[in-house]
Amino acid sequence: MRRVSLPNQLNETRRRSPTRGERIFGGYNTSDVYAMAFDEMFDAQGIVRGPYKGIYAELAPSDASELKARADALGRAFIDQGITFSLSGQERPFPLDLVPRVISAPEWTRLERGITQRVKALECYLDDIYGDQEILRDGVIPRRLVTSCEHFHRQAVGIVPPNGVRIHVAGIDLIRDHRGDFRVLEDNLRSPSGVSYVMENRRTMARVFPNLFATHRVRAVDDYASHLLRALRNSAATNEADPTVVVLTPGVYNSAYFEHSLLARQMGVELVEGRDLFCRDNQVYMRTTEGERQVDVIYRRIDDAFLDPLQFRADSVLGVAGLVNAARAGNVVLSSAIGNGVGDDKLVYTYVPTMIEYYLHEKPLLANVETLRCWLDDEREEVLDRIRELVLKPVEGSGGYGIVFGPEASQAELAAVSQKIRDDPRSWIAQPMMELSTVPTRIEGTLAPRYVDLRPFAVNDGNEVWVLPGGLTRVALVEGSRVVNSSQGGGSKDTWVLAPRASAAARELGAAQIVRSLPQPLCDPTVDASGYEPHDQQPQQQQQQQQQAFH
């Protein structure tokens, strides 16, 4: 359904005082680029949707200078607090847009259930694949789907987590289609990045828009670290009341180092690099100023390939020799588990609805995006026949790199990707050109629609799957672009989940509380605190090789 021009509130706004809100929403969605998209603030008749009425009322009276002042305040707060991401060794502030994305309580309940269902099914799948492999024996999914996945590690076979949890943290990427239905775009089960921006976006927004938080029942996000710490402690193999937990980071050159540092500080645990740990007699120890200390749980933000030079890449200087054997002996827990990538491979993604039915005996609550699998002969031929209308994605791609948008590609680009698909069909999938939803976004002094996605974060502590209310909304700031990654011009939005009015348990987020709990400034991430000499490029290169899919 083609969206009509926006009358009602918007036209009424245009008829009122020409010096105020008309200039902010007056030209909203006059471009044909977003004509088919589902706009989250306005319906097809231009009526402000219920969850956004308060935000519209706050923003409509603003003029361009007021919007700029607030946007500048957001930017300064990010810089002052050291909220950056690293791209090619350069620290950059992560753009935060001033218009939040809002999700109603009933809608969030549906999403929460769907995410929980998906995580439970993937947990069953990983336990099965590294155990009895019943799903393969029953012929539910092809055996070669697993054996051909580069993230299936035989080193992980036989490593049984003490409390049965392999996916301690999951990031489930969602989009909203032209009908307004949420769909799963991708699963992230290894080291999903971006939760630090969820928390810092909220803190910063509360400082700049305190009146909005006073009039909306926005569910809190600042207790994520406590849920993560509980999950990590619950996973410990020891019976000690206070297991030693550490966060293992590749180092200061990694794009997500800010997040590693923030989470370690909020959980009250040590942030360590591989050189801070060593193994002896299948035990893991941490070097401290008071001597060595045994480690029980490692929340590692290092890719499998770099984790243990005795098992994976022998040239890794980021990991710890002997770590896998210590995990196999049951003396340390690695979070997330080795080999989880066999559950978030983009080709494996297409079989998750089947896994839900097989393991849980339930119908999927969240649909996938329709996907064609190039490794299947008939689907590959369909892809090649329709290549000009599809989006071609490399199975191992991340950060938006390697994606070819058929309708926008040149003949040479289409010919090149067609040949790649023929040469290595296992490495490619294809999806229709999805119409992502849009949210008003500040662009050059006014508000205009821009495409968004959503990454909610789920934490599994062995007793329940808890989903952080909201998640990271990423926005494609370039007009017409569907690539939301920060490395390609994307930004973010604060994501508000509104609490049910009858709920006393879900506490409101007050601006005063946020100001009191602002974090202390981190050390300058551009300062080399690693102890490596500037000419020692190997650690820096390996850290940068692990740029998270979030970026």
Curated annotation (Swiss-Prot):
Compositional bias of kind Basic and acidic residues: 12-22
Protein name per the record: Uncharacterized protein Mb2434c
Region listing for Disordered, in residue ranges: 1-22, 523-551
Bias (Low complexity): 537-551
Family (UniProt): To Synechocystis PCC 6803 sll0335 and to M.tuberculosis Rv2567.
InterPro entries: ATP-dep_Glu-Cys_Ligase-2 (IPR051680), CP_ATPgrasp (IPR007302), UCP005522 (IPR016450)
Start-end of Polar residues biased regions: 1-11
Organism the protein comes from: Mycobacterium bovis (strain ATCC BAA-935 / AF2122/97)
